[in-house]
Amino acid sequence: MEREARSRTGLRVLIGLLFLVVLLAVIWFVTLPALRPTWTDQPSSEDVVQAFRDRGLEVGKSYPVEQEPGWDERPVPKTYEEATRFEIPSLGEEAGGRVFVFRTQRNLDTVRDYYEGLPTSIRPYVYVQNGVLLQLNSNMSQSEAQKYKDVLTATA
């Protein structure tokens, strides 16, 4: 009887360990694609901003988004690999856009969902090409925003 009880306990431990191994394997296979780079041969965010300049689009100062005053307090998800803030002086002080470069679709979707979830009155233009997200101030006209989108499409 005692031997039978030990045998059942051992079997329960073995089943528990097997369940744990299967669970860990499932978690690994589910998260692995999110960790692998989705895109290759992406331009840097500064390359995209320079392409705007080269094509004659209005671009004032540009700098890494981390140098933007108050960036750390902004609720924009920080899932990007690198990003550049650029100003468009005709839109007013501190108005312009940002170019974000992402490693995975999941990280890109997090930022795109944030911007697209903003109230319509302040929702910026958001364009995506090859893992690069362009966010433009909503004060700009649709036709002007389209010019930046076209350069992004040609560059990324």
Question: Which residues does each predicted region cover?
Answer:
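Soluble, non-membrane globular domain cores that form compact, hydrophobic packing
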Residues: 1-96, 102-156
